[in-house]
């Protein structure tokens, strides 16, 4: 069958977590798994960071479950709300609740994520897709992440 790459990136478009899921599955069910794998090592005796300041996501990640997860971990959700959810909320009137907080200025930084995915998909090792096993496909995605990080890091 088919596979799909899921990854979390930092503000520079560098992948922090890379996973491969089923191609026919949605993106939002993989989000809690991606977030649980997030580990950012820091220099010295500073503890490992597992909580980002904010998560920028598209409308596919605008679910109550994801927003509740982010709220429970004190992570700011910068996720646009789909029109159908806006309509359902307004149809319920005062019982529909307030719209979720949305920072349009921060959301403009989401293009970094899209450019990161574009770079992964344009890389010949993954674009040609000779790998038949999900394991080797993930290995290729991780190798591409290593290339990106090696270009970024200066010694």
Protein language model regions, located:
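Generic alpha-helical structural context detector
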Residues: 33-36, 118, 145-148
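Conserved active-site beta-strand-loop modules that form the wall/rim of enzyme catalytic pockets
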Residues: 4-6, 14-17, 27, 53-54, ...
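Solvent-exposed alpha-helices and their adjacent loops that cap or buttress functional pockets
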Residues: 1, 8, 47-49
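Helix-centered, glycine/charged polyanion-binding patches within enzymatic domains
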Residues: 43-133
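Charged phosphate-binding loop/patch that engages nucleotide di/tri-phosphates or the phosphate backbone
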Residues: 140-155
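Short conserved beta-strand segments at catalytic cores or DNA/RNA-binding microdomains
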Residues: 4-15, 24, 31-35, 116
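Conserved, well-structured core segments
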Residues: 4-7, 17, 118, 135-144
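Active-site beta-loop-alpha junctions of metal-dependent nucleic acid enzymes
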Residues: 19-45
């Amino acid at each position: 069958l088919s596979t799909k790459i899921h990854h979390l990136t930092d503000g520079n478009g560098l992948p922090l977590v890379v996973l491969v899921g089923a191609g026919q599955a949605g993106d939002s069910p993989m989000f809690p798994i991606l977030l649980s794998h997030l580990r950012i090592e820091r220099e010295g005796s500073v503890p490992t960071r597992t909580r980002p300041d904010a998560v920028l996501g598209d409308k596919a990640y605008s679910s109550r479950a994801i927003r509740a997860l982010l709220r429970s971990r004190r992570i700011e959700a910068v996720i646009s709300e789909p029109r159908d959810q806006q309509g359902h909320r307004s149809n319920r009137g005062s019982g529909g609740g307030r719209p979720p907080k949305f920072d349009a200025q921060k959301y403009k930084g989401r293009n970094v994520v899209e450019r990161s995915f574009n770079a992964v998909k344009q890389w010949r090792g993954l674009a040609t897709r000779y790998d038949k096993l999900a394991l080797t496909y993930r290995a290729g995605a991780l190798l591409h992440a290593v290339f990106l990080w090696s270009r970024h890091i200066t010694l």
